[in-house]
Amino acid sequence: MRQTILMKAMFATALLLMLGMTRTALYGQSSEERAKKAPAKTKVISTTQSGMPIVWRDPGTVETLDFVGGLGGREQAPKPPFTFIEEDRTGSNPKIKVMDANGVKWSVKWGSEVNAEVFASRIAWAAGYFVEPSYFVASGKIDGVKKLGRAKKYVNSDGNFTDARFEMNEKGITKLDDKQSWQWDRNSLVGTREFNGLKITMMLVSNFDNKDVRDLGRGSNTAIFQYPVGDTVESRYVVTDWGGSMGKWGGVFSREKWDCKGYAQQTPEFIKGVKGGFVVWGWSGQHTKDGAGGISGSDMKWLLQYIGRINDDQIRVGLKASGATQEESQCFSKALRDLILQMQIL
């Protein structure tokens, strides 16, 4: 009997060692090793040389977050007077670079994306995702404006403007964008609940514009922001443009930005069901499969711990702070709550 017990103990020890080796083989690989095994046709983005990649951080008590000030808070809102630096001719919308009274540099945007970008980024921020501090400025004046191209339509000769989005240029950050930006289907965070939660958040606000490093000709909407943290560097995966939100997802000729009627009309199509353990979404965008695929019910349940705690008052004040009219605020508030309810029911 003593020999039998000894043999069982030896077998159990061997089994544990085998399991440990298997786990190491599955999960202990570096991102470089995983990259070598990936198909050669698609470049694998790795940030291990620059620092640990991260896409999400616990937002804390979601119910108390200020949707007026957002990430930057009310105290960091752009302060006039604004001084012209130069016109930014990149992207599809008119933009100007300015400096405010506090010496902070801002990217000022006009056009169809202004309201959507401010509000959608508030939702992403409340869910724990990294965004850039942005504010809606109803009117103002930029001193020293000259030689405007696209922005001439939105800025008078005396520098006065209306309905602009101000996005802060944070100091001390290295931004890896364009050719160094990340790809939705090829990065070290694919398959994690945090990364899948980002995809759900994109669909929740109906952001069809999930362009990435594959779309350099049209401009990537992803980037890696390197933040110094002590003696190390934290590499944050960021969606840099939320302007294609709060409207209709779909093809080139059907999608819209900041269109509550279209946003509400697509509410019944938000979630189609569940197949093979994965949620089937109605959403479509620039990269539909990469944006909607591989999301489980447990991923959605995890995200609801944060998204589900955003209250109606926060939504309303956030919409108002984004420049929404009272009618738009009522419409968007109801539609967004209905979408969150669909997730909770499923």
Q: Which residues does each PLM region occupy?
A:
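Conserved kinase catalytic-core segment
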Residues: V114-E117, R122, D177-E256
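C-terminal catalytic region of ATP-dependent kinase domains
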Residues: Y227-L346
